[in-house]
Amino acid sequence: MGNIYTRDIKRIGQQIYELYKDQITTDYEKNKELVKQVVDVYSKKVRNRIAGYITRKAKQASRPVEVTEQQEELEE
């Protein structure tokens, strides 16, 4: 089971994702450096969680649309 992200992590991650969508990749290390440059994070743990959340969103966005269409067909 994975960890649940707090509201603050999600809010900050969503804002960074919307503002810097063109710079975000599916590579965690690159996203971690981006978060370090963009946000003045008070701890390494929070920075890493934000970077992980952004990476996960980027991977979800890069998934093919066909997968979601198949899921919709199964639900009907």
UniProtKB/Swiss-Prot annotation:
GO BP annotation list: translation
Heme in keyword set: no
Record-level GO cellular component terms: cytosol; ribonucleoprotein complex; ribosome
Keyword flag Ribonucleoprotein: yes
GO molecular function, one term: structural constituent of ribosome
Domain of life from the UniProt record: Archaea
Keywords: Ribonucleoprotein, Ribosomal protein
Recorded family membership: Belongs to the eukaryotic ribosomal protein eS17 family.
Name of the protein this chain belongs to: Small ribosomal subunit protein eS17
Gene that this polypeptide is encoded by: rps17e
